[in-house]
């Protein structure tokens, strides 16, 4: 994929790894290499849960229409907006005693309509999560409905993209009301989002 894009004038700009929880992957896909019984019987049959990757390409040159976030990032798409380390840092800096839920509620209530991007702590905390090279906060079940593989002969390649990934990328890389190209339809997640 990377070579194909590079051969057509694009440069790989970023790669994001989307972590997958092994038990949920096993349950959804029925892949045998994630079964615990093979650790006992023959661990050479075992493999890790494969992550998803988002590859971001850009062409050289100036972007004629900058993607702007005039108030910073205001919506978080994912499961865990505040990491434990973030809570401790915030509490020490502000002499508070919030837990993760209280801190997130405080940030949303205090900064949701905040216009100064430099002091908008909500935007800064969202960006800390998004700026990670591994997105471990994507809700694996936040997908459009599809039929799970249950029988041995079922198709095992149905992997709808999580809506958090789509929403996050559209928010990061497009302006409001822009038309976004989706090169494949799949189960329709991009169009739905």
For the regions a protein language model found, what residue spans apply to each?
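Core catalytic lobe of class I
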Residues: 1-193
């Amino acid at each position: 994929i990377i070579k194909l894009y590079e051969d057509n004038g694009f440069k790989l700009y970023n790669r994001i790894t989307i972590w997958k929880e092994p038990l949920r992957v096993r349950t959804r896909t029925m892949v045998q290499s994630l079964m615990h019984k093979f650790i006992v019987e023959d661990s050479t049959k075992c493999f890790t849960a494969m992550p998803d990757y988002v590859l971001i390409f850009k062409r050289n040159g100036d972007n004629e229409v900058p993607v702007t976030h005039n108030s910073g990032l205001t919506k978080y798409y994912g499961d865990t907006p505040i990491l434990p380390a973030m809570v401790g840092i915030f509490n020490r800096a502000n002499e508070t005693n919030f837990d993760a839920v209280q801190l997130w509620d405080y940030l949303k209530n205090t900064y949701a309509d905040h216009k100064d991007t430099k002091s908008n702590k909500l935007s800064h905390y969202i960006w800390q999560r998004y700026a990670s090279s591994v997105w471990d906060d994507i809700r694996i079940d936040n997908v459009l409905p599809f039929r799970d593989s249950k029988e041995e002969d079922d198709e095992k390649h149905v992997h709808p993209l999580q809506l958090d990934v789509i929403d996050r990328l559209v928010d990061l890389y497009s302006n409001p009301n822009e038309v976004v190209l989706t090169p494949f339809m799949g189960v329709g997640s991009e169009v739905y989002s």
